[in-house]
Amino acid sequence: MDIFRVLTRGASINKKANQKGKTVDYSTADTDNDKVDNKQVEKQLNRELDFFRNKKIVSKVETAKAKLEDSVEDSHQQDNNDDVTEVAYDVKITTKEQASALRKSYKGNITGEDIPLPIGSFEDLISRFSLDKRLLNNLIENHFTEPTPIQCEAIPLCLNGRDLLACAPTGSGKTLAFLIPLLQQIIEEKNFSGVKGLIISPTKELATQIFNECVKLSKRIYLDKKRPLQVAILSKSLGAKLRNKVISDKKYDLIISTPLRLIDVVKNEALDLSNVKHLIFDEADKLFDKTFIEQTDDILNSCTDPSMRKSMFSATIPSSVEETANSIMNDPVRVIIGHKEAANTNIEQKLIFCGNEEGKLIAIRQLVQQGEFKPPIIIFLESIARAKALYHELMYDRINVDVIHAERTAIQREKIIERFKTGELWCLICTDVLARGIDFKGVNLVINYDVPTTAQAYVHRIGRTGRGGRSGKAVTLYTKLDSVAIKPIINVMKQSGCEVEGWMNNISKITKREKEAIKKGKSHKERDQISTVPKVERLKRKKKQDMIRASKRRQLESNAIESAD
């Protein structure tokens, strides 16, 4: 927009008149042209002042929008009203035809009974659900101006009190999709004391991230004159305070926790979950697998309110999780954005054959030489021992790298994540502890040094890049041992619309026996050690270490015999 034009509008200079030496009365400038300019400038200002600018949906919705704008503009001209904030540019979904067109635009598949209409913009929440103004202001301050597809569907469903099973790609805004309705419902239930909302996350890092987002959205929201909306993450220190009655559990309205810590506090009768009205499982496929299912079941048994609303969110929803959801939910609605086993379409996916383990290190170094190793970068491995080994190899290559895994303390992990987020650290090596939910802004490259054991693990790993509409790249290194394990990866690549090479189309379908082997981690033999030292040299070193240990053992035995004599 030309700012100088705005500042000088209303002034018109007749150059020919000046050349003839005649004076010009600027007060009699061309009013018709000025009106046209003013009209164009006003329309531009209106659009720039509209915080809730909407995406292009389909021609029917756009036509309705254009008619609405024209009618509003005509009425403003007739009434000579200069209040630009009254001009509405939002797309309101009022019919099933509009809803169908919107869902078709983002490939949404919604199944269930009595499904409410989606929202076309955040302004829809004001007219349909009387969204709290303080919550709306917090959305604007944090630059959340346009709902993503999962938010368009999940928010009205939750605000209508429906149980929900939601699946959407990584980085698509699932956290906001359950936080907005949850906070709105807590505000509406301000007369009830105690914990009203509960969010369960499989890892502490993800729980912390959800807590930080929740704090931003609940800023300056008071349930009465002196009591702000209280959000807490159930840390070790908070658990101790609750057990020792230093703090009452009635203080908090919303608690975010990992399963085991929550169960520990509940079993000690330090936290009452009987009043919880909204229960949300983030990364539901992980929380309902064999690792967490018993803990999740204990949590469900502790939440005794029969009217409690339950929601499950994840980027991947296996059929087993769907069966569990249908058994514990009341008339749930199933929302799938895209394909439930597909990765984010903004991610360029690539497979690199390395022959053997030594070839993987060579491939990493080739990426560096070819300029494809562009930070920030995350490298995933299958075990802590292998993550440590790769860290030492890359550290000696003078790459700005660090490693994070379950053996690191909570403080160490937090510091490493903070360094990575601020750009101080370029490359982060980790296990699957960081594969889920953690939102790192602007990750350019994800490297699967070890092939993931399942398609779900692969989708979550590469989902650390390509978030928030940005593009990203994912590279998976594989060897002869991974000939079976890469089959699910190739299927994900096809479903995500990636270009695949000819041999990928000709690969045989994965058998039931191979699926079971992959799930049990038996799809390949034990991997070789990560090292650039030749195998012959490693065997020599091992033989030498064995000789030293044997010598020490003989020395101890002889000392024991002498002391006995």
From Swiss-Prot:
Q: Which residue ranges does the record assign to the Helicase C-terminal domain? A: 346-508
Reactions catalysed according to its record: ATP + H2O = ADP + phosphate + H(+)
Q: Which GO terms describe its biological process?
A: endonucleolytic cleavage in 5'-ETS of tricistronic rRNA transcript (SSU-rRNA, 5.8S rRNA, LSU-rRNA); endonucleolytic cleavage in ITS1 to separate SSU-rRNA from 5.8S rRNA and LSU-rRNA from tricistronic rRNA transcript (SSU-rRNA, 5.8S rRNA, LSU-rRNA); endonucleolytic cleavage to generate mature 5'-end of SSU-rRNA from (SSU-rRNA, 5.8S rRNA, LSU-rRNA); snoRNA localization
Helicase ATP-binding domain sequence ranges: 155-335
- List ligand-binding residues for ATP: 168-175
Please report, in chain numbering, the residue ranges of the motif Q motif: 124-152
Q: Where is the composition biased (Basic and acidic residues)?
A: 516-529
Segments forming a coiled coil = none
Motif interval(s): DEAD box: 282-285
One GO cellular component this record assigns the protein to is: small-subunit processome
Name of the protein in its database record: ATP-dependent RNA helicase ROK1
Organism listed in the record: Candida glabrata (strain ATCC 2001 / BCRC 20586 / JCM 3761 / NBRC 0622 / NRRL Y-65 / CBS 138)
Matching InterPro entries: DDX52/Rok1_DEADc (IPR044764), DEAD/DEAH_box_helicase_dom (IPR011545), DEAD_box_RNA_helicase (IPR050079), Helicase_ATP-bd (IPR014001), Helicase_C-like (IPR001650), P-loop_NTPase (IPR027417), RNA-helicase_DEAD-box_CS (IPR000629), RNA_helicase_DEAD_Q_motif (IPR014014)
Q: Where is this region: Disordered?
A: 516-565
- Subunit text: Interacts with the U3 snoRNA and is associated with the 90S and 40S pre-ribosomes.
Q: Name the Enzyme Commission number(s) assigned to this protein.
A: 3.6.4.13
Where primarily located?
Answer: nucleus
